[in-house]
Amino acid sequence: MIHMTPEHVRWFADTGKSVTTSEGKEIKIWEFKHENDEEVLKGWSKHFRQHYCLDEEIDEFREGYGFSRAEFLEKIKFPDRYKAPGPSTRSGDFSEILVSDYLEFILSYWVPRTRYGSKTIGNESTKGCDVMAFKFINEEKETPEDTLAIFEAKAQFSGTTVKPRLQDAVNDSVKDQIRKAESLNAIKQQLYYKQKIQDAKLINRFQNPVDRPYKEVSGAVALFSSNLFNTEKIAETYVSEHPNEQNIQLLVIHGEDMMNLVHELYRRAADEA
């Protein structure tokens, strides 16, 4: 479960600023200060590509099509750059993966990356909870302080009218109470199929909260291109109807020209395979 921290993680910057909602909830503000750094982007594109298809699997999967590696990824695995709903699926997948990186490499959770490789239709979003992350106090012994974090991510990287994406993430997070059991099973099955048996068994810890209690943290994240980041709009977010209201974390991540970054990362992920 120990992974090297990818270089692009250094582009996460805690602004030290926050916004307080009318309910008194704190919204933390982070910035993603990406740069045109060839080596960092190259490493990031490989990290990103592995979510959809491991490099050692591509040749086997593309063989019957007669596609190059890039063609297989672009035509079969990745959301389409132009054909709807491909662009919105791209921004959604990208955002979920970026939030996964935040949880794993900044907050030190274990985040299984099983959500995208099993997609049947590249242009469609995967059903279930967006990001599930796990923290064990002691892997040898269960404690009530073991934590399951379930985060929902919503993005707006284009357009001119600011949308209430943080509220959308909160509203979607409400549904996670219903989706949790099935999403845990989906992760466990994919780990099992990948022969990661010990990792799959770790999911057992969180499948029976009545008999084996643990902490559950909810999270709602809005990701914006910086020109669409509006503090007044996000301050309108409310969580009073959320079943985990006392344990929900609110976060905004914004960065410059994010949609072009999304497309560039997908291009690199295909071309550099």
Describe the residue ranges of each PLM region.
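Conserved catalytic cores of phosphodiester-cleaving nucleases, focusing on short active-site segments
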Residues: 103, 131-133, 149-155
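A short, highly charged nucleic-acid-interacting micro-segment common to nuclease
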Residues: 78-100, 120-122
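A short acidic/basic microdomain associated with nuclease active sites
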Residues: 106-124
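Acidic, metal/cofactor-coordinating or nucleic-acid-engaging core segments within structured domains
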Residues: 159-229
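Charged, often glycine-rich, active-site loop that binds/positions anionic groups
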Residues: 76, 123-133
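Charged, structured surface patches that assemble and position nucleic-acid processing machinery
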Residues: 201-273
